[in-house]
């Protein structure tokens, strides 16, 4: 499960400008994106 969260974190950091990763499964996985970059998940 940690691998999924780590992968989600990497994807968020590399794609957050598109604001496509902080939704659904990745956003639910510990809300990693929100913790790292609030602007990434603010569109939720």
From Swiss-Prot:
Primary location class: secreted
Tissue spec: Expressed by the venom duct.
Record note on modification: Contains 3 disulfide bonds.
Assigned GO CC terms: extracellular region
Protein name: Conotoxin S5.1
Coiled-coil regions listed in the entry: none
Keyword terms of this UniProt record: Disulfide bond, Secreted, Toxin
Domain notes per entry: The cysteine framework is XVIII (C-C-CC-CC).
